[in-house]
């Protein structure tokens, strides 16, 4: 396995956006890699390995830069409880989707991409319409469905997790900077089980190719260290409008890769 420079650059860019805006690594990088001729089993498991490490790394630095409170001291913080809840539902869904997609039904990739893109576009539009509200009602119960849906997306195509959980948090009334940190850590934990699911089906003859691992991991890890500082210093109002607009771009980009 060797380092591929342009893959490192792409991984760095998409992870920088992912750990800063809560989305984009798998959703943006997967279609590009498939267009370059790589197979899903060369891409999806590797993205899950990388996201497992970068998610934890970004989560630690988000905590250090005080974008979020992940403390366990005396009483578990609200943010940590939300993270664990999102993770629990996401883990169940990602295990189910990996088995269903790559071992049982083998759902067509284009169908999955179209579904994820339309979902992200719809949620991005809702988040933009919500922007004019000065305050949001905290509704944590909404997160159960978003977390399960995001985990299902992640297992199918390696992407579609961040946009759903991130926008789901915003629609549930969670502060933008905290939401970005929460999705990073939750995605890291969910990705561990996702990769473990691929290891399980590999024992039944499904082959995993690790050729992209060094390049994707290198670019992603560097970005995961830098991005929490960006979240810390950039005003929250910027993220409030940037995140849904970026989601719309991700949705349009994904659809264009499928149909153009």
Model-derived segments and spans:
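Juxtamembrane transmembrane-helix boundary motif
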Residues: 1-19, 28-42, 59-155, 170, ...
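Alpha-helical transmembrane segments of helical membrane proteins, especially in multi-pass transport
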Residues: 188-201
């Amino acid at each position: 396995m060797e380092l591929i420079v342009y893959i490192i650059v792409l991984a760095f860019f998409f992870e920088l956006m992912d750990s800063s805006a809560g989305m984009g690594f798998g959703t943006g990088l997967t279609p590009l890699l498939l267009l370059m001729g790589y197979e899903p089993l060369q891409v999806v498991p590797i993205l899950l390995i990388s996201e497992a490490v970068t998610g934890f790394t970004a989560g630690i630095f988000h905590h250090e830069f005080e974008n979020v409170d992940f403390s366990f001291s005396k009483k578990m913080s609200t943010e940590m409880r939300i993270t664990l809840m999102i993770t629990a539902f996401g883990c169940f869904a990602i295990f189910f989707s990996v088995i269903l997609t790559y071992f049982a039904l083998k759902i067509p990739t284009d169908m999955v991409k179209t579904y994820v893109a339309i979902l992200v576009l719809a949620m991005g539009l809702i988040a933009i319409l919500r922007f004019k509200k000065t305050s949001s009602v905290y509704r944590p119960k909404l997160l159960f469905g978003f977390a399960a849906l995001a985990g299902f997306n992640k297992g199918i195509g390696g992407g579609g997790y961040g946009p759903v959980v991130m926008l789901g948090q915003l629609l549930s009334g969670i502060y933008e900077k905290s939401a970005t940190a929460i999705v990073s850590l939750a995605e890291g934990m969910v990705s561990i089980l996702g990769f473990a699911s691929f290891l399980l089906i590999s024992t039944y003859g499904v082959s995993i190719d690790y050729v992209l691992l060094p390049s994707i991991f290198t670019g992603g890890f560097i970005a995961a260290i830098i991005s929490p500082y960006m979240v810390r210093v950039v005003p929250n109002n910027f993220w409030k409008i940037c995140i849904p607009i970026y989601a719309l771009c991700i949705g349009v980009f994904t659809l264009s890769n499928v149909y153009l």
